[in-house]
Every structure is written in C-alpha cells, then in structure tokens.
Amino acid sequence: MIFSVKAPIPGFESIKEVELEKFDDFFVKFISKSDTTVFTLINPFMIRPYEFEVPEYFRALLDINEKTNILILNIMIIATPIETSTINFIAPLVFNVDNGSVAQVVLDANLYPDFCLMESISKYLNKEKSE
C-alpha cells in the first residue's frame, strides 16, 4: 500500500509518498516513492510497553478517530553488531491504514520521559535473553 506523507518528516522533507514492505512481525521496510530513501522500521509493541496519545493536530491531519485502523512503527538505525542499533521511540510514524496517510509524530519528551530519540536495542535483547 502507498501512503501519502501528510507532514514533512524532519530531515527528509522531500518524501511525499512511501510504501511499506513487511519482513516479519518485528520489521518493516519504509520505501520512499519520491527518492531513494529506505528506512528499517520496527513494531515497538513487540519489544516493550509503548503507549502514547496521538496529539489532536495529528489526529485531525491523518483523519484519525476511535474506529480508525492505525499502525505505529518506529525508525530503527541498523548497526553492526546488531546490539548497537538504535530505535527512535520519541518520534513514531503513525499510519492511517484506512485512508493511506502517514506522519511522523514528535512526542513531547516531558510527557514521555521513557521514550528516547536513540535508544539502544540491546536494552531489549538482553531483557529477552534473561527471561
């Protein structure tokens, strides 16, 4: 499915349309249809508790209501070794699957102090190993 970018993605303002390619329950490839940009996205709910309120501005922009089918994914920077990879939890990508729109929502760090811009995935890999 092609998604229309409704608000510029910081640092990637030229991206107007994107396509998602699912790898598995954890990972999704974010492919720009406007240029050659490709991101690896991760389903945050697979690795940690992750809950936030989509701000009213973005709910209106993406036409989100209580019945809307939404998808939340986070940008992951893949590194070698994998334990040094990072995830951006403070600025999730919110997809309205019903109307094919997306925006990156930069959350208020004061309201969500547990969400970081570059959180190491090792924090979650080690947790899974110890359980």
Q: What is each stretch, according to the model?
A:
Residues F52:
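Residues that recognize and position ribonucleotide moieties
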Residues E56-E66:
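Short active-site loop/helix that positions an aromatic residue
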Residues M1-P49, K67-E131:
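Long, compositionally biased stretches
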